[in-house]
């Protein structure tokens, strides 16, 4: 059986938005993407959880991610527009969304 081992820089120069990044699958995805060199936007409901993930990423040598606390279930149209505007100002594009 073959086991694929991607190069540790396979996601370098890739910008990925991770929803639910404060815990669970979102957190694990964010940590994995960071390990492979991605620039991350961490979206989640709880700022303290996002900060914990950010600290893990930085401690392990990853790039500092952008944090954006927002509850998608209760967000208003204006909240979504503000989030989109923030991303457009800080990043030229997105390569992936989880």
Write out the residue ranges for each language-model feature.
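A glycine-rich helix->loop->beta "capping" turn
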Residues: 61-64, 86-97
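Aromatic pocket-lining residues of Rossmann-like dinucleotide-binding sites
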Residues: 33
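Conserved Rossmann-fold cofactor-binding substructure of NAD(P)-dependent oxidoreductases
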Residues: 73-90
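Conserved N-terminal Rossmann-fold NAD(P)-binding element of oxidoreductases
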Residues: 16-20, 43
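Rossmann-fold cofactor-recognition segment
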Residues: 60-76
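Flexible N-terminal pre-Rossmann segment of NAD(P)-dependent oxidoreductases
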Residues: 1-17
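Conserved glycine-rich Rossmann-like NAD(P)H-binding loop of the short-chain dehydrogenase/reductase
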Residues: 38-52
């Amino acid at each position: 059986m073959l086991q694929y081992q991607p190069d540790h820089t396979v996601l370098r120069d890739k910008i990925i938005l991770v929803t639910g990044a404060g815990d669970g699958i979102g957190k694990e995805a964010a940590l994995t993407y960071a390990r492979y060199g991605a620039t991350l936007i961490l979206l989640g409901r709880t700022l303290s959880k996002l900060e914990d993930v950010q600290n893990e990423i930085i401690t392990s040598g990853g790039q500092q991610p952008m944090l954006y606390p927002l509850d998608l279930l209760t967000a208003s149209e204006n909240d979504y527009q503000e989030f989109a505007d923030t991303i457009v100002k800080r990043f030229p594009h997105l390569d992936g969304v989880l």
